[in-house]
């Protein structure tokens, strides 16, 4: 199938509120994952023994953000960039990312008073080269993905100018990532494969923005909710991930995901196992016309169930609480799919509530970490399950308020001053 990269843009751009719901859900999963880690950040004197409510979907959420970013950029720039439009493109991208990021960086420096970074590290963050030139400040650790975003935005410029097919560029990016990951131990540079594999996700969103038409009738909200529950489940119920990992070892004779001591934010070869899930979620949330959408969703729901067999055969789960939440989410994903008609009203209500969160999702994603670090330094009112619960509530409220102020007050003011 020949993918047409540049088509005549639609005369009317319709804002997709369902995508806002997806953004909101992904950002909530990131902050929930960070808040529920057993590291005494939320409550310095208490950490739950059986942390059954922790989810490890933060990394998956970032992958979804990358796919979403490529998709949105593709919709916003259906025509090739020219020397007259590149400046405006760069300006819009920087204004969208940098002002909020810079304010959160200042807050992160305040939160780092016990482990203040060096001037070189601060300079690396100001220039957004952290993770490449300097270590990443823990109090703003989610910022690693913003560096990826900036690089992807820059790489989009030649793709657009020269009308390159993003599908072919994605395949080339996979090859570059695999070759460099294979020889990573020889030349000691795991950065390139990480960016290459991350770019595959971004390009996949760009491809999706150029292909498939929108359905005449929208996809049921129950399917959207099923996708979100499935997204929560697949980090622990990772049979597709494990299968892909083993195929990779069989093909290359080694684990391409094991590089060197590169730590925060690395995107590895094995993450490609989640690319089909990310794409299917985006297809469903954008009402794309794809053959056998329902059957494909059912297949993706069924695959993780083989994880239970693997756990049973190898007796890997000594602490059953660790799979309680993923199993519950998995059951809800299947129920929303199987009983779509019965849960449609409730699913529509929940998705529309998440739409409101999507408008502050970037602010939530970047500001919650400095707030969490600040809370870890407050020792009063801590040490019990009750204080933990109250602190969790305060953390969520503070993060939402800060994100609202950044997105709805500060960002519009900055745009007004710079345009």
Regions found by a protein language model. Give the residues of each.
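Hydrophobic alpha-helical segments of polytopic membrane proteins
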Residues: 162-175, 204-231, 292-307
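C-terminal ends of transmembrane alpha-helices
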Residues: 40, 131, 177-188, 233-244, ...
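Loop-centered beta-sheet repeat module
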Residues: 180-207
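Small-residue-rich segments of transmembrane alpha-helices in multi-pass membrane proteins
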Residues: 96-100, 201-205, 229, 304-305, ...
């Amino acid at each position: 199938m020949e993918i047409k990269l540049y088509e005549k843009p639609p005369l009317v751009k319709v804002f997709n509120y369902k995508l806002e719901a997806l953004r909101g859900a992904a950002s909530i999963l990131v902050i929930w994952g960070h808040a529920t880690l057993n590291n005494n950040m939320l409550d310095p004197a208490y950490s739950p023994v059986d942390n059954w409510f922790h989810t490890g979907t933060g990394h998956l959420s970032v992958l979804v953000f990358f796919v979403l970013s490529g998709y949105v950029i593709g919709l916003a720039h259906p025509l090739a960039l020219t020397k007259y439009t590149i400046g405006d493109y760069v300006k819009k991208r920087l204004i969208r990312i940098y002002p909020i990021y810079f304010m959160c960086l200042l807050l992160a420096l305040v939160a780092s008073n016990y482990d203040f970074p060096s001037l070189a590290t601060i300079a690396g963050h100001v220039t957004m080269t952290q993770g490449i030139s300097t270590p990443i400040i823990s109090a703003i650790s989610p910022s690693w993905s913003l560096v990826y975003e900036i690089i992807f935005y820059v790489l989009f410029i030649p793709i657009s100018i020269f009308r390159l097919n993003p599908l072919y560029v994605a395949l080339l990016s996979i090859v570059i990532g695999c070759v460099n990951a294979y020889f990573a131990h020889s030349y000691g540079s795991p950065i390139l494969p990480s960016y290459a594999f991350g770019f595959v996700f971004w390009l996949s969103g760009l491809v999706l923005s150029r292909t498939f038409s929108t359905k005449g009738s929208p996809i049921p909200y129950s399917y959207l909710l099923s996708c979100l529950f499935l997204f929560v489940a697949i980090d622990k119920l990772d049979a597709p991930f494990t299968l892909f990992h083993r195929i990779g070892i069989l093909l290359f004779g080694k684990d391409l995901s094991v590089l060197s001591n590169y730590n925060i934010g690395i995107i590895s070869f094995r993450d490609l196992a989640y690319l089909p899930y990310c794409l299917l979620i985006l297809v469903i949330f954008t009402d794309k016309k794809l053959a056998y959408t329902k059957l494909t969703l059912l297949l993706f729901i069924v695959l993780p169930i083989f994880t239970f067999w693997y756990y049973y055969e190898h007796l890997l789960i000594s602490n059953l609480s660790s799979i309680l939440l993923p199993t519950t989410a998995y059951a809800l994903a299947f129920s929303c799919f199987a009983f779509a008609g019965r849960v449609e009203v409730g699913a529509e209500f929940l998705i529309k509530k998440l739409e409101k969160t999507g408008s502050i999702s970037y602010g939530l994603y970047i500001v919650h970490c400095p707030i969490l670090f600040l809370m870890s330094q407050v020792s009063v009112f801590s040490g019990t399950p009750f204080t933990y619960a109250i602190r969790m509530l305060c953390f969520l409220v503070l993060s939402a308020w800060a994100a609202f102020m950044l997105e709805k007050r500060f960002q519009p003011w900055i745009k007004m001053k710079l345009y």
